[in-house]
C-alpha cells in the first residue's frame, strides 16, 4: 500500500482543508493511505505583530517546505492566498482545488451591515487590503489589528474587544460557522485577496510520482481564475505588505478580471479591469496591472 504524507499547519481550518484533500485523494486512488503531518509555523506562533511586520504570508509555508525537503512529508496543503507569487525551487502546485466562496464576511454580534456600525466603531482586521476598503467605505472606523485562527478571532469579538471583525467567508463555512456571517462583502464593490477561497497542494517538482497522484484534484477553471489574479499581483510586485485585491470570473469562454490597489491609511482605491483568454492568464493579469499603473498605482504603492 502506498502512503502519502501531507504536511499541514495545526489550525482547525488548515486541518479541515488538509483532510478535505486527503478524502479526495482516497476517493481518486483506492488503496492509497493518506496521513496528515501537523506542524507549527512561525506565522502561527507570532501573533503580537502583523504578518507584514514579521516577514509576510510566506512564513506559513517555510516549515512545511522544509519538511518536504527533509523527506518528512510528500506534499503540503495551503490556502492559496497565503502562497507567495513565486515559489522557491523545486516546489510546484500540481493541484488547485475547486474554489470555495471568495468573499469576505462582516461578523458582528450587534450590527447587521457595515453601514449600520456606529460612528467610530472598532473593527478588527490585520489585512491591509481589508483596511483600505474599510477606510474607503467608512473613514470614521477605528481599525485594530487582529491575528490568530478563526476561532481565536471570533472569541475576541465575543469578549467585547470589537464591534465587528472581517473574516473570509470560506473559512467560516469550512468550519461549520456560516451562521456567524453577518453580512457578505462581495465583488464588484468589495474585492477579495488574490486566490481567496482556493486550496492548493504543493509538492517537489522533481517527484513525478507524487505530482501525478495530486494532479487529479486540479480544477482547471479555478486555476485559470486564480492564475490571472496572481499574475496581476505579481506584476504589481504585491505581497501582504501591499493592499492589493483581485477577482476573476468566467464570462462565457473568457475571463473577466477586476483588480484594486488601495491605501490602508486614507482609503484611496484604484480599480482596473479587463477581459481575456483563459489560455493567456499572465497577459490578462499584466494588462489589469498596467491599467492600475496608468491610474496612479505606482505613486500610491510608493507611499507605503
UniProtKB/Swiss-Prot annotation:
It catalyses: 4 porphobilinogen + H2O = hydroxymethylbilane + 4 NH4(+). The keyword Transferase applies. Binds 1 dipyrromethane group covalently. One of its GO terms (molecular function) is hydroxymethylbilane synthase activity. Gene3D superfamilies: Periplasmic binding protein-like II (3.40.190.10), Porphobilinogen deaminase, C-terminal domain (3.30.160.40). Pathway: Porphyrin-containing compound metabolism; protoporphyrin-IX biosynthesis; coproporphyrinogen-III from 5-aminolevulinate: step 2/4. One of its GO terms (cellular component) is cytoplasm. InterPro entries: HemC (IPR000860), Porphobilin_deaminase_cofac_BS (IPR022419), Porphobilin_deaminase_N (IPR022417), Porphobilinogen_deaminase_C (IPR022418), Porphobilinogen_deaminase_C_sf (IPR036803). The porphobilinogen subunits are added to the dipyrromethane group. NCBIfam families: hemC (TIGR00212). Belongs to the HMBS family. This is Porphobilinogen deaminase. It comes from Xanthomonas campestris pv. campestris (strain B100). The lineage of its organism: Bacteria, Pseudomonadati, Pseudomonadota, Gammaproteobacteria, Lysobacterales.
Amino acid at each position: 500500500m502506498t502512503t502519502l504524507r501531507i504536511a499541514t499547519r495545526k489550525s482547525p481550518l488548515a486541518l479541515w482543508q488538509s483532510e478535505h484533500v486527503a478524502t479526495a485523494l482516497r476517493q481518486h486512488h483506492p488503496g492509497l493511505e493518506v496521513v496528515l503531518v501537523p506542524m507549527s509555523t512561525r506565522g502561527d506562533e507570532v501573533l503580537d505583530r502583523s504578518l507584514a511586520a514579521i516577514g509576510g504570508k510566506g512564513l506559513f509555508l517555510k516549515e512545511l517546505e522544509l519538511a518536504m525537503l527533509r523527506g518528512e512529508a510528500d506534499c503540503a496543503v495551503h490556502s492559496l492566498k497565503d502562497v507567495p507569487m513565486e515559489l522557491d525551487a523545486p516546489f510546484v502546485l500540481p493541484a488547485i482545488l475547486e474554489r470555495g466562496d471568495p468573499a469576505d464576511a462582516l461578523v458582528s454580534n450587534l450590527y447587521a451591515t457595515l453601514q449600520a456600525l456606529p460612528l467610530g466603531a472598532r473593527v478588527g482586521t490585520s489585512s491591509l487590503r481589508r483596511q483600505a476598503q474599510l477606510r474607503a467605505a467608512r473613514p470614521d472606523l477605528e481599525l485594530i489589528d487582529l491575528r490568530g485562527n478563526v476561532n481565536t478571532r471570533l472569541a475576541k469579538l465575543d469578549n467585547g474587544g470589537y464591534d465587528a471583525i472581517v473574516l473570509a467567508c470560506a473559512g467560516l463555512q469550512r468550519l461549520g460557522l456560516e451562521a456567524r456571517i453577518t453580512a457578505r462583502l462581495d465583488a464588484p464593490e468589495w474585492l477579495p485577496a488574490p486566490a481567496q477561497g482556493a486550496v492548493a497542494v504543493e509538492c517537489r517538482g522533481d517527484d513525478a510520482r507524487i505530482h501525478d497522484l495530486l494532479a487529479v484534484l486540479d480544477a482547471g477553471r479555478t486555476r485559470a481564475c486564480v492564475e490571472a489574479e496572481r499574475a496581476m499581483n505579481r506584476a504589481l510586485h504585491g505581497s501582504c505588505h501591499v493592499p492589493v485585491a483581485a477577482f476573476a470570473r468566467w464570462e462565457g469562454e473568457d475571463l473577466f478580471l477586476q483588480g484594486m490597489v488601495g491605501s490602508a491609511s486614507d482609503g484611496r482605491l484604484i480599480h482596473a479591469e479587463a477581459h481575456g483568454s483563459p489560455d493567456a492568464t499572465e497577459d490578462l493579469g499584466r494588462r489589469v496591472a498596467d491599467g492600475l499603473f496608468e491610474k496612479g498605482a505606482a505613486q500610491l504603492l510608493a507611499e507605503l
